[in-house]
Each structure stands twice: as C-alpha cells, then as structure tokens.
Amino acid sequence: MDYKDTLFLPTTDFAMRGNLPQNEPKRFKAWYNERKVYEKMKAKRQSAGVSFNLHDGPPYANGHLHIGHALNKILKDIIVKTHYFAGENVRYVPGWDCHGLPIEQQIEIKLGGKKNETSKTKIREMCRAHAREFINIQRDEFKDMGIIGDWDDPYITMKFKFEAEIYKGLCEIAKKGLLIERSKPVFWSWAAGSALAEAEVEYKDKEDYSIYIAFDLSDEANKKIGAKGAKAVIWTTTPWTIPANQAICLNPDEIYVLTSENFIFAKHLLENLVQKGISKGKIVKEFASGELENLYAKNPLNDRPSKFILGEHVLMDGGTGLVHTAPGHGEDDYYVSLKYGIETIMPVDDAGKYDETIKTKKLFRDNVVDEFVGMHIFKANEKIVELLGDAVVSVGKFTHSYPYCWRTHKPVIYRATKQWFIAMDKPFKDGKTLREVALNALKEVKFYPEVGRNRITSMIENRPDWCISRQRDWGVPIAFFRDKATKEPIFDDEILNNIYEIFKEKGADAWWELDIGELLPKNCKYEAKNLEKVVDILDVWFDSGSTWRAVLKSGDYDAGEFRADMYLEGSDQHRGWFQSSLLVSSAINETAPYKSILTHGFTVDEKGQKMSKSVGNVIAPQEVAKKYGVEIMRLWVGLSDYSSDLKISDNILKQVSEQYRKIRNTIRFLLANVSDLKEIETNNFTMLDKWILSKANIAFEETNRAFRNYDFSKGFSVLLNFLSADLSGIYLDVCKDRLYCDELDSSRRRSAQSTMVLITRTLLPLIAPTLTYTVDEVMEFAPEIVKNGKKDAFDLVYEPLEFEDFKKNETGELFIESRAKFFEIIDTLKKEKKIKSTLELVLETSSNEILSHDLDEICDWYMVSHMRSIESRDFLAEFKVEDETFRLVLSDHHKCPRCWKFDAKNEDELCPRCQKVLNVK
C-alpha cells in the first residue's frame, strides 16, 4: 500500500526557482508605479524616533551605467534599507552631476568644425539636452536594479534653483575672504584647454627624457667660490621648460662641491652621481649653498641669466641637488621665485604650444626661434636637447609616474595662468584657516573602514589652494563683475543677491544671455559701462561639493537634515567628492556635511585585473541582470568585502547563484511546512526546538550586529553558516519525521512549526535589505501565520529572537559533539555498504543525561529508530565522547512503510506511531 497521501507533505506556491531575470522587472515596476514603495517607506516610519539619511554622491549624466555604478547604488540601497528594516525613518534622494567637460566634449564632437561658429548659449543648451537624455536613461537603468529612492524628484545640478544655490555658496565663500584670484601654476590640460583641480588628475606611467644640463657660472659666481669655468649641473625630465628657466635652486642646509670636471653638485648626492657615470667623484672644493645665493649662471639654450636661489623644497632623494626653476611651470618653483621677486614667464598657450613670448622674451636664440613658435611643447623636447649641444652632460630615457587629464587621457602640464582659488591657509574663522577648520571637522566624522580617516586627513594636510576656475562653457559661471579700470572683482551684496534671484528664475545661462545692465539691480551704485564679466566657470567638483547645501539645507527636497548621516562612494572620492564637500561646508558652516563616510573598492575581474574593453573582461550590470538576475548582483555585493576591490566574473556569479539557491530553498522549506499552522504554540518547545531557537538567536544577533556596522560579508558568513549547518543541515532534517508523519495537531509537530515560523519571521527582515525582491516575493506567498498581519516586505521590522544559549549546559555539548562523531561513523558505514540509512540503527549510550530526555526527540536528533542504554555485544561501531560510550546496533524491528523507521513488529506493518495517526491496528 502507498501511504504517501497520508503524510503531511510540505506545500507552498513559493517557487523553487526564482526565474529572476523574467520576474524581477514586473515586481520592480509595481514597486515604482502601483505600490509607490518609497512613499510607503516614509509613511511607515514617520513617527520613528530614529532617522537616517544617506546623501547620494551624484553620478555623471553621461553614458550608460557600468558595474561600478551598480556596486555603488546597490550598496547604498542595502545600507538605507538596513536602517529602514531596523525601524528607522530613512531618506534617500538620488542625484546627478550635470556640468563639466565630458558632456561638453560630446557636444564638440557633434558640432565638429562648427563649434567656433556656435554661441555659448547654444552650446549650453545642447549640453543641457544631452545631460537630460542620460539622466532619463540612467534613472531607468537604476530602477531596473530595484533601487528604492525618490526617483520622482531627484536632485539635478543643472536645475535653475540648484545652479543658483551653487552660486550662492560661492558668494558666501567670497564674502569670507577665502576666494582669491591670482596667476599661479596649475595643472593644465592642453587637450581640454582648461585648468584642472587635483581631483581631475590621474597618474600613469610615461616615458620621458632624463637629462643633466650644465649651466656656466658667471665670472662673479666663479670668483665667489674660488673657481674658474665652473658649471652648475641641473637634472630635468622636461626639456621643454628650459626656455622658461629663471633660476637654479639649492638647498639652504646642504654642502655643495666642485668636482674635477668643474661640475657643481650637492655633496650628499655625489656618490649616486658617480654610480650613474655623471662624475668621477673627485672633490676639488666644498662650500655652503649660501655662497652662491643671488649670483648667476647662464642658460645654455638662450644665454639668459639664471639666478641662484635657496629653497627648502630641494630634496636629496635624486637629481643633483640643483633644481632647474621655471616659476611658470611648477608650484615650488613659483613660490620660491616669488620670495626673490623673480618674474614668472609663461611662453606656452592654452593648446600647449609655444607662443610669441619666446620671441619677445628671447627664450631661444634668434636663428631658431621662428621654428618653435606654434610648436607643441612635447614635440620640442628632442630639438631642444639637440640645441643644448655640449651643455648636455648626460641624456637618456626613463619611465615615471606622470599626471594625466582624467577626461581626455592626455598628459597635463603645469602652466601659470590667472585663476580663482579657495585659499587653504588664509585665516578666516577665529583666526583659523580653512585647512585647520576642515581637519578639525574630520575629527567628528566616523569612517568605514577607519583607514579612510588617515587618507583624507593626509590629503587635506598637504593639498594646495583649490583652483576652482575653468576656461570652458558648460558649468556654473563665476558670476562676478570686475571694475574695468582696476580689474578688481566686485563682491557687492546687492549685486550678488540680484544675480542669485535671476539664476533661480532663468538659470545660470542668464550670465551669457543678459547684458551687464540687465544683471544689475535697480538703482545700482555701479554703472554697467564701467564693469566687465568674469567669463570662467566653476570646477564641477565645486558643484558636487555644494550638493549638501542645495539638497539638505534648501528645503527644496525631502532628503533629511543637514548634516547627512552618511556619504558613501568609491575610495577615489577621498580626493574628490568627500574632499570638495568638506571644504565647501567647512568654509561656509565650519563643519563637515557628513557624520560618517563609507568607502568601497573598485570592481575587478576574477584575476584582480582592472576591467577594460580592450582586454575584454568588462561585465555590464544589464547583462548580469539578464543572465542571473539583479538579486544575484545584490547578494554578490552583500557577500563581498567591499573595503577592498571586488572581484566579479561569470564563475563568481555562478557561486553566488548557488548561495542564493540555498537561501531560497531553505525559506521555501520553512514556508511549505507551516501552511496549516494557525497560531504559534510556545509552551511545548522540545529540546531540539529550544536548541535551534538559541542557535538562531545567536546567529541572527551576530549577523544583525555585523549588518548594523555595515560589515555585510561577515554578517552573511555567519548567517549562511547557520542556515546550512544548523538549520538545514540538522534541524530541518531531523524535523521531517514529526512534520510529515506525526498527527496533524501533535504537540511535537506544532512546536516544530512554531519554531520554524519564529525563525522565518526573524530571518526575513534580516535579509530584506539585501534580498528585498526575494523577501517581497516570500511575503506574497507566505501563509498568514508567517506574515503576522503584514502585507509585504516593506511592512517588516527586524526584532531579535530571545533564547538562551543551549550549549551553556553540559548536555548540550555532549549532544552536539556526539552527533558529529556519530555521522562521521555513518559516512564510513555507508561507504562500506553496511547500512543505507541511519533509520536501520539503534543507538545505545551510557549517558544517563541523554537518556533522561524524551526518547522520540533523541531518536530524531541522531535520526535513528531507537535509543537505549548499553546492552548489545554485537554492534557495528563504537565511539566515546566525554567518557560516555555510544554503540551503533542494527535494529531487529522492521521498516514501517509509512515513516520508514525500523519500528514495526512485522514486515509491511505500520509502526505503533503510524497506526495511531491513521487510527488502524
């Protein structure tokens, strides 16, 4: 007879396979449209005592999303939901960065040769349309990932009011005296035709000249050190800067030597130069660097005088100890030359070519100068080396780390131009500088991981003044007027406020669309005819660094309060958004705009290599979603240690899919076995129920602590170990007999079901921040006893289980260790084909502690048919745990055709338990 229909087998409509790629889009669409889950999340927690807002670091509105975007937004979504499912009132307003060079370059490509004929207003209009197009594209792509946020009202930096707020912040900084305009060497992208901030520069290996050049000393300088025909030898990697040389800088504290070759070097570096073959090392004379100060050598390229000066920046870690100084091409060069009143010469134009300055300043000899006018500086290197002739002591090539424009990917140069800067070291607040205020503010910020604190602190300590001006079209203008006569900027409150109001109404385009008279307030004391406009625009990092003001302080967005609870971006943003936001906020508010910073690594392939189209190892999030599902991408983020680079590949995603399958099937088993339970019974928990509840309590709380500390990989490690080892590996397995075979309403069956419901209710909100789709699907198909009055995933709140640790008492240890040892022996017996199932066995033990418990429970624990005290001499195996003996004996009973336990007196006869359940004899 087939007894299958008499068993209480599991039943649920929650599918074994998620079919995520097919099903996710439908549920996501419902979240955004019919169910309005973000609005629901706000409404559900509006009376919560604790709030959390994550301020979104804006992605750039250009191009499609890549896997790095997916990592970033998923991690943000998980963290916001970690707070939400803990019962907190959360806010997340996504945003976009819209201004800047990449979009402008796209428009230049579209315009081709017509760019010069196109007005700034038209270019800006096209840039705005381009940004708008990609905001819509990226918004849909983010929503396709199931990211929850205020997608109906995101912040967009090119909105008129937003541009006005950026400008207002600039005005406040100007009025505090921190905005200065001066000519100074800055990173210059000749390919983009604009100045760059430090954050816009990336370093790559570049092959350059390594050249040692001898400058003849003047007669006076020779006489001063008692030499004849002495030569000061400098080392440089940029021969193209030699025409602009104005000085040779020595370290004020070092001793210098004259060698037998008549070369002057720092004594400290002589041995190194001997090894390089630059000198034989024989010292003729030693002297202090100060002896040459304010005397001259002669530039061998153009015979112009080069002044000997002293500077602390001259290090003894390479070169000759005599530093070629061109104040227009280096920051140290500029500052040290300033002290000596040396003129800054700039012979290079915006495009990186020599201009007419090389003629007027006689930077080349007359017979060759025409050849160099209009020549790109990098093409001039070889020709300059040739012209230097015998003055070249040594020349070669070497590879070194060199700054590149991160947008054009072309090498940049240092070039002195007139720019706007935010001063780092000018006192403004109680005598403190912006650098000091910012460093102070960082002390109040929490970092995840903590190493981020040292990184950004070091950067703030060592950074130069912030160059915020750009010579481009698409950005927020530095909308100030100058006095035509004096060229001084005018920071008049009435004018600045009027421009702010105009920008709010018409956008920053008004700066180019309106005449000066139209931009001035009525009855203004300044006359339009005496004024001129500043035509530079703001560094796009100033835009993003001002988002806290426009989003958190303006009242225009329901984004939470200033300061944000968290800023979260990739680790490169220590030098980018984290820093620009800190500086703008410190200048205006004297505080950081964030309470905490969390950083993540970059996505790399399985071998740890950077993703590159040329290498062919790029993984697009859209493809992952189509093949595996977004939920797998989310679990990949949850399982990964985001504090370092995250590896992703097809193989890794398959492994994550397997982990997801285990989680899903565990939940499915739990749901399927409680479908007939109407109310939880807590009075009759068995020892096994109490054991798994205590294990669940420990695992869930450790997981929750890790999640609340944003250590998701640790949390999932603990959780998955519990689900596979304790819950699925032991408890659910041993419960099958009482769930399927006991009477429907037996206390053992109901206590197991009650246990499973309690575990499920706690598990779902715990994993909901990461596996939101899955939990929402679970809630659709879960029986009412699991839902507990809740409608969907967004109604859930994590509440801990509270059960004591079962392993605290001695019996608990004995149970666990003996079971592990028992199943080790079972594996051997099965391999030896002595048994097929543990149900064929009787387990005998000398432990009175174990035998004092309910025997049915103990049988379930070891999954045997009988338990008894030691009595058999004929046994299959024997083992000891804690001085207690255990013997495995073949049962002399028959297999019950219903429950398969060896507890029937006769063949094909039901065991006593099954007879009772079916009411047969």
Swiss-Prot record:
Subcellular location per the Swiss-Prot or TrEMBL entry: Cytoplasm
Record carries keyword Membrane: no
Top-rank lineage group of the source organism: Bacteria
Molecular function as annotated in GO: aminoacyl-tRNA deacylase activity; ATP binding; isoleucine-tRNA ligase activity; tRNA binding; zinc ion binding
Motif segment ('HIGH' region): 59-69
Binding site for Zn(2+): 896, 899, 911, 914
Subunit organization: Monomer.
Domain statement: IleRS has two distinct active sites: one for aminoacylation and one for editing. The misactivated valine is translocated from the active site to the editing site, which sterically excludes the correctly activated isoleucine. The single editing site contains two valyl binding pockets, one specific for each substrate (Val-AMP or Val-tRNA(Ile)).
Function: Catalyzes the attachment of isoleucine to tRNA(Ile). As IleRS can inadvertently accommodate and process structurally similar amino acids such as valine, to avoid such errors it has two additional distinct tRNA(Ile)-dependent editing activities. One activity is designated as 'pretransfer' editing and involves the hydrolysis of activated Val-AMP. The other activity is designated 'posttransfer' editing and involves deacylation of mischarged Val-tRNA(Ile).
Family of this protein: Belongs to the class-I aminoacyl-tRNA synthetase family. IleS type 1 subfamily.
Designated name of the protein: Isoleucine--tRNA ligase
Protein species of origin: Campylobacter hominis (strain ATCC BAA-381 / DSM 21671 / CCUG 45161 / LMG 19568 / NCTC 13146 / CH001A)
Gene name of this polypeptide: ileS
